[in-house]
């Protein structure tokens, strides 16, 4: 994968995260600045998701720690847990929000 393909794939994941948050109706604010997406919760806690172009990875930082995701079989997969990125984002959002979120 070249850098252009990497950015296109990450853009698609970021869009999926935004749409999932919007569709859920959860009280989560998000902002994208450059290569960084910040999710902010009612208690002001944050989840930071950023693209690491040199390694072709997506990194996620939350209350639970830091996680690195690589594209494996067309899925962004965590090197620590084996979870897919979108599943971990949803799980971490629920931890930060302190409640179950209806992801529809």
UniProtKB/Swiss-Prot annotation:
Keywords: Iron, Metal-binding. InterPro entries: CyaY (IPR047584), Frataxin/CyaY (IPR002908), Frataxin/CyaY_sf (IPR036524), Frataxin_CS (IPR020895). PROSITE patterns: FRATAXIN_1 (PS01344), FRATAXIN_2 (PS50810). It comes from the Bacteria. It comes from Vibrio campbellii (strain ATCC BAA-1116). One of its GO terms (cellular component) is cytosol. GO terms for molecular function: ferric iron binding; ferrous iron binding. The keyword Iron applies. The gene is cyaY. SUPFAM superfamilies: Frataxin/Nqo15-like (SSF55387). Coiled coil: none annotated. NCBIfam families: FeS_CyaY (TIGR03421). Belongs to the frataxin family. Involved in iron-sulfur (Fe-S) cluster assembly. May act as a regulator of Fe-S biogenesis. This is Iron-sulfur cluster assembly protein CyaY. One of its GO terms (biological process) is iron-sulfur cluster assembly.
């Amino acid at each position: 994968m070249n850098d252009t393909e990497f950015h296109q794939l990450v853009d698609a994941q970021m869009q999926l995260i935004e749409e999932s948050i919007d569709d859920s109706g959860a009280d989560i604010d998000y902002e994208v600045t450059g290569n960084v997406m910040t999710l902010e919760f009612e208690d002001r806690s944050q989840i930071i998701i950023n693209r690491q172009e040199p390694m072709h990875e997506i990194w996620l930082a939350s209350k639970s720690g830091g996680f690195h995701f690589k594209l494996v079989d067309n899925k962004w997969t965590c090197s620590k847990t084996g979870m897919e990125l979108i599943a971990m984002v949803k799980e971490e959002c629920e931890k930060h929000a302190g409640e179950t979120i209806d992801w529809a």
